[in-house]
Amino acid sequence: MKKTLCLLGLMSCMALLPSMANDDCWKPAEWPVLKHYDSEHLKEVALPLGGIGTGTVALGGRGELRDWEIMNIPARQYSTVTIGNDAPFFAIYTKAPDAAPQTKMLAGPLYDDEYIHYEGRPVNHHGLPRFTHASFDAAYPFGQVLLTDEQMPVSVRIKGFNPLVPGDEEVSGLPVAILSYEVTNTTQQPLEVAVCGSIRNFIGKDGSQFWTDWKGDMIPYGEAKNHNEYRSDDAQSIRAIQFLTDGVDSLSTAWGNMCLATDAVAGVSYRTCSADNAWSASVLDFWDDFSDDGVISNPTANVRKSVGKDQDPMASLCQKQVLKAGETRCFNFYLTWSFPNRKAWSKSIVGNWYSTVHPDAWETAKEVISRVGEYERQTLLFVNALLASSYPDVVKEAALFNLNTLRSQTVFRLPSGHMLGWEGVMDRFGSCAGSCTHVWNYEVATPFLFGKLARSMREVETEYALHDDGSMAFRVTLPLQNPDPNYDVAADGQMGCVMKFYREWQLSGDNAFLASHWDACKRMLGFAWKERGWDGNCDGVMEGSQHNTMDVNYFGPNPQMGFWYMGALRAAEEMAVAMKDKAFAKKCHTLFLQGSQWMDENLFNGEYYEHRITDPKTFEFMDPASPDLPPYQLGKGCLVDQLVGQYMAHLCGLGYLGDQTHIRTTLESIMKYNYLDDFSTHFNNMRSYVIGHEAGLLMASWPKGRLEVPFPYFAESMTGFEYTAAVGMLYEGMEADALKCITAIRSRFDGSRRNPFSEPECGHHYARSMASWAAIPAFIRFQYSAVEQTMSVARREGTWFWSNGYAWGTLSIDAGEATLHVLHGDLTLSTLTIGDKRYKLRRTLPAGEQAIIAL
């Protein structure tokens, strides 16, 4: 603290007088670690902290906060300011008796490629002293950064998380990043320690608007008359800075409020404004003040010339404690926010669910601080249950780490509660609007972990995308209203929606949900039978023009659309039986038998299923050697996800859609022809998601001859498609091959080259990557029906995490007995099938209870 203080500065120091203990603050438990990233594998690590549909800020691999994406749009690598020392940061002050104080930024060292720039500042905080060593531990959503430095008398573990509790979308949708700085005194004497967070008030600056100065620097803008207020509540043990604005348009997507809070009461000091930033003096003034004694105060009047002029004043919140020799203490901070004006792909504001529940970041901070221990316990219960299971670590990693997509700007919830999503997100805007059906068909994390949200997506599809004639827009418009008359249909997307509706009905057991949407489901499937449609002659085979997830139209029967169609017929048959619609059930059954047999007899070539191309006008089969073949087809290619419909059928409990031996042979062929141990000699004319000496599954291979112009993505490799093949292998007992594929994927996301918490396709945090969760139920053949009140698993010794979207827990199996433990929600079961034996339960197990079955 500087010697000359203004009145506000004196007032801020009074909090230091009573004590510096803060013994009642939240003390994080020991967090699990699934994956460790050493100092050579940190550069791309960015773990998103935020709730479902709230946006996030990421905890970087070396401890910095990066990717500030809390204002309704993506903002990769956006730090709220022009690259420099003004970006948000946390710093630590230490003072040992009879020793000079030391101050450093709480982050690890610069990387080797961060040393060159036309102004010598290619990275934020380039001029701040840093710790010399960093590493990162993760078990999503828990991230931990360990900072050490031989010159510092402390080691620091930065812990960051946001509550993630399957089955509880509200707790999992809190707009908060929780940070705890665990500081350990590594000396043999007492130590003064202060930790301080500093953030400029960037309300209005969401990273979408920049101007370029004379040097070429990109200067973000949008802030207007922003100011910061210090707030406290002794009853709830909270001190905070609230970030507000008087000038940003209240209809701007970047309008809202934020809060940086601490649960410390003693030893708290703060700044609500900053010095004039000419020649970067504001950081200089802060650093001098903080480094003096670990206590801060607002700049004096003659220094803070920018007050009233500075549109984005920097605020700082600091807490100071005394650590005994060898002692560890926690310095906790909570960043909360509310930015209600989401537009997504609409021209008008559609809003956010979370901001209707949490409109005031200050109130949110109070709520979170009062319940943080409970939120941590609930999240740990989930993560520890999964990590303690007997699944291979790489399966846990792929399933767990890809849940980040649910918290990214890919996903949002409308004020009505409906969940929607982009396909993924680019650096500054969403990628491919409309909850695209043929992309979201692949992911299964939402239905198995957040059933209510999955059902809301089915409501959107049936109520706002489906036309009277049964055609469905595969991209829904916003605001939600009558289906868009200018729309496109997708065969795979629409057939998948029938299967997904069946899945949500089965997992929820809500017969009213089915009854109220049964007519819509019939129209969805029935559209395939329109004249000159996908199956216009109603023979169980799709011959028509089939738009699909390859962003082209396939002409003629092919396995990708064919198995989606077979799955939709099976799902519709089961729903029709439940609705006592005998005629429709019979029709679906007949078409399924015809279509399945035809595909096995006419598309299976002895190794895999192929595509028989038809004339787009006549629907007649064409000679594969004809020069008049339409472009962008599959033909005789071996497609990585040709069995995607079978993948979904297994997950839904609908059985085999084709000959079982053909299914297995096809997966063996995919492994034989599509898997590459090394991509360094592979030619790819499109996007490269696998490069050099990395391994993975190709989208398509051509053992029987390639078309001159195949479908666009044939030479690529994308994780969501790879997971469907790997999961199919699990169902066929090809465990070694499945794990080889999944390991190849996750090895590419090693923190050095790619972010372990974002698997991209057409954009970061791509929705299809959540197909990785399917390996969890597939590994133990998990099936659950709330309609029939049944659960079944393979008889496989070990402890296995299970979930159905509403309840979750573990099932432990050994030679003599099985223990079914419910950890969250209520589970009603009539029978439990383990292997080939059925056991009657006829009871409801609430959370915390278990059933023991003698085998």
Stretches found by the model and what they are:
Residues 22-110, 248, 389-390, 398-402, ...:
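Beta-strand-rich N-terminal accessory domains
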Residues 64-66, 72-78, 83-89, 96-159, ...:
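Non-catalytic C-terminal accessory modules of carbohydrate-active enzymes
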Residues 22-31, 36-41, 45, 144, ...:
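Acidic/polar, glycine-enriched structural segments that form the non-catalytic walls/loops
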Residues 47-48, 57-61, 67-71, 81, ...:
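Short, solvent-exposed loop/turn and secondary-structure capping segments
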Residues 427-471, 515, 519, 552, ...:
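Active-site core of glycosidic bond-cleaving carbohydrate-active enzymes
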Residues 170-172, 180, 267, 284, ...:
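The feature captures the catalytic groove of carbohydrate-active enzymes
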Residues 91-97, 101, 105, 111-116, ...:
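Aromatic-rich carbohydrate-recognition surfaces in CAZymes
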Residues 1-23:
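Bacterial Sec-dependent N-terminal signal peptides
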